[in-house]
Curated annotation (Swiss-Prot):
Pfam family of the protein (one): UPF0004
Cofactor binding mode and count: Binds 2 [4Fe-4S] clusters. One cluster is coordinated with 3 cysteines and an exchangeable S-adenosyl-L-methionine.
Name of the molecule in the record: Ribosomal protein uS12 methylthiotransferase RimO
Coiled coil: none
Subcellular localization: Cytoplasm
Protein species of origin: Pelobacter propionicus (strain DSM 2379 / NBRC 103807 / OttBd1)
SMART domains assigned to the protein according to its UniProt record, in alphabetical order: Elp3
Family, per entry: Belongs to the methylthiotransferase family. RimO subfamily.
Upper lineage: Bacteria, Pseudomonadati, Thermodesulfobacteriota, Desulfuromonadia, Desulfuromonadales
Gene: rimO
HAMAP family according to UniProt: MTTase_RimO
Keyword Cytoplasm included in the entry's annotation: yes
Length: 450
């Protein structure tokens, strides 16, 4: 008699939160087709690796994960290994040749066909590749299996990127920027709120470009004004806001709307005008400094995060010194520093005056030492203040301590708050008095639930 046991699927999603949303859509589609989802790869009949290929380290992490999980086909129940996302979109032929243990490759525009593709695979032993144009735009009618904790989720408001930064391969992998329809986003946010989500993290390659490809005048501000009206949503956080797209209207909305976190992630990449010009960034040093001054003036409690690149081709010691001085002066609450990754197919890859890996690493260390000191000082300034904190469970070190995040901390990238006194349930938002701090984390006591 034919077995009716459901096929089990496990997903490993690598890279950014935007990639995670793609993975969640694939899982939702498979769950709708009655596949059973498991977080244990050892139990899985089908394993999907959703990859990133943005920089060298991300590519290596993806390859390592693929090779590791390929072993499951030898020592476990896995019979189908799928590689999806940016890596196959970029390196289809090379991967198909070098990784015969992979059964299916799926690009960034074809993942919504995951169930159909698996059905096609059941009729052949051949390796299959589905790498089309990256033109898909997710909408709220597709099922999405939220893999984040129940109280927060990412809301991806657009696909692709139309910026042409000289170091970045994303436009080739994801296509031009396409805004999702306003009503579709509101509908998805309402669905998330109905499931208990309290925190929306707004993401795309550049959230300030939202609506620029629409003809009805829709903007990011238009969307935010709708989202704040949704019952149950208490925090709305803005990630990946390009500096040249931050309008006075957006600043005023962040300042005045209680549901919008006093938090802004602005990828600046550098401060030296010669480097910014080589990077093909649209903002110059003066514009960046004026924007930061305005943000600090209009929203004194704003937590600012940025990302910077060191070792870009042509970056001189003078350029790097300017960058160090800028970090000292700007006093970012959070800072990510990346060594420039020479990516084939980008204009920067063929630029002269490439910086050595040794110099890149040294510059990275110097900037991170500066930021650790500044972050410690910024956190010390919060001692004695009261912050809104979402409780996320027990500390990994001891069940005597709860942990959470303040509205000044984004998921996964910004540090945590350790709670030494008071009780609350996971997912509660509480008022917490800060009593101590470290370089990147805060410590405090619950005052009241909100």
């Amino acid at each position: 008699m034919e077995s009716t046991e459901k096929q089990k699927v496990s997903m490993v999603s690598l890279g950014c939160s935007k990639n995670l949303v793609d993975a969640e859509v694939m899982l939702g589609l498979l769950a709708r087709q009655e596949y059973e989802i498991t977080t244990d790869e050892r139990e899985a009949d089908i394993i999907i690796v959703n990859t990133c290929s943005f920089i060298k380290e991300a590519k290596q992490e993806s390859i390592d994960a693929i090779l590791d999980l390929a072993e499951r086909k030898n020592d476990g129940r896995c019979h189908t290994l799928i590689v999806s996302g940016c890596l196959p979109q970029r390196y289809q032929e090379e991967l198909a040749r070098e990784l015969p243990e992979v059964d299916i490759f799926i690009g960034t525009g074809d993942y919504p066909r995951i169930a159909e593709i698996l059905a096609e695979k059941s009729g052949t032993d051949e390796q299959l590749c589905y790498i089309g144009d990256p033109d898909f735009v997710f909408d709220e009618t597709l099922p999405r299996l939220n893999s984040s904790p129940a109280w927060f989720s990412y809301l991806k408001i657009g696909e692709g990127c139309s910026n042409r930064c000289s170091y970045c391969i994303i436009p080739k992998l994801r296509g031009p920027y396409r805004s999702r329809p306003l009503e579709a986003l509101v509908a998805e946010a309402e669905q998330l709120a109905s499931r208990g989500v309290k925190e929306l993290n707004i993401i795309s390659q550049d959230i300030t470009r939202y609506g620029s490809d629409m003809e009805d005048g829709t903007t990011l501000e238009t969307l935010l004004r709708r989202l704040v009206q949704i019952d149950g949503i208490q925090w709305i956080r803005l990630l990946y806001a390009y500096p040249d797209g931050i309008s006075d209207a957006l600043i005023a909305l962040i300042r005045d709307e209680p549901k919008i976190c006093k938090y802004l992630d602005i990828p600046l990449q550098h401060i030296s005008d010669p480097v910014l010009k080589l990077m093909r960034r649209r903002s110059n040093e003066q514009q960046i400094r004026e924007l930061l001054a305005k943000l600090r003036r209009e929203i004194p409690t704003l937590a600012l995060r940025t990302s910077l690149i060191v070792g870009f081709p042509g970056e001189t010691m003078e350029d790097f010194t300017s960058l160090m001085q800028f970090v000292e002066q700007a006093r970012f609450d959070r800072l990510g520093v990346f060594c420039y990754s020479r990516e084939e197919g980008t204009p920067a890859a063929t630029m002269p005056d490439q910086v050595s890996e040794r110099v890149k690493r040294e510059r990275h260390r110097k900037l991170m030492r500066i930021q650790a000191r500044l972050s410690f000082k910024r956190n010390r300034e919060l001692i004695g203040t009261t912050e809104q904190v979402i409780v996320e469970g027990y500390s990994e070190e001891t069940e005597l301590l709860l942990k959470g995040r303040s509205s000044r901390q984004a998921p996964d990238i910004d540090g945590q708050v350790y709670i030494t006194a008071g009780t609350a349930d996971v997912g509660d938002i509480v008022a917490l008095r800060i009593t101590d701090s470290s370089d990147y984390d805060l410590i405090g006591e619950i005052q009241e639930r909100t």
